Amino acid sequence: MGSTVIQNQETKHVKTKEFVLYLLGIFFYTCMTGMVGSYRNAYLVNVLKITDDEASLFNTLVSVIPFVLSFFISMYIDGRKTGKSGKFKPLAMFVVVPMAAVLMLSFWTPKGLSGTFLMIYLVTIAVLWGAFCTLGNSINMIANVMTPNMKERDNVISFRSISSAVGNSAPLVIVLVIGLIWKDNEGLQYIIGAGLCSAVGIITVLLGMSTVKERITYTAEKK
């Protein structure tokens, strides 16, 4: 029994295809999150022309509310039973489509909204985004359970971090290129950038999650 465990920990489990598709999923997932992180405030100020007081209120609300919600969402994820597909993979597959939709809505505002109604809309979208990001972080956790081989796991985690960092910065290049084509319409630049990140993000995350396997099974025991 002991030799079987040792052999299992030394065997290479993650295939090249699985490894590459997982990293692609990570790259474009963080490309989605990076789009909001890099350009949401610019959209609010430069396109919607919200005031400094409105921007301050918005930033306060979207810092506090999602932070509180993240505790409950994290508790749900932690207490969630591991199914046949794993613990984290189903969550990543479930959340990517609504997350992409909210990404688009983060850079689109219905005409005619102003004042309190505009703020309610913006905060609602931002809170949804924060909640989906907490769920979507499951895609990062998958790297920890892809293989019982410690060296292989460290390698996956290392490349995941690199892919995530590069993907997070990718929207800066995407919007820059779009800006060379549509120079005089900043709002259009953002919505096109969000659309590209959303479309490719859905495809790559679903493709990666359909290929990746969670090979470490664990249970959370209550004492």
What are the residue ranges of the model-derived segments?
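Membrane-embedded alpha-helical bundles of multi-pass transporters/translocases
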Residues: G2-K223
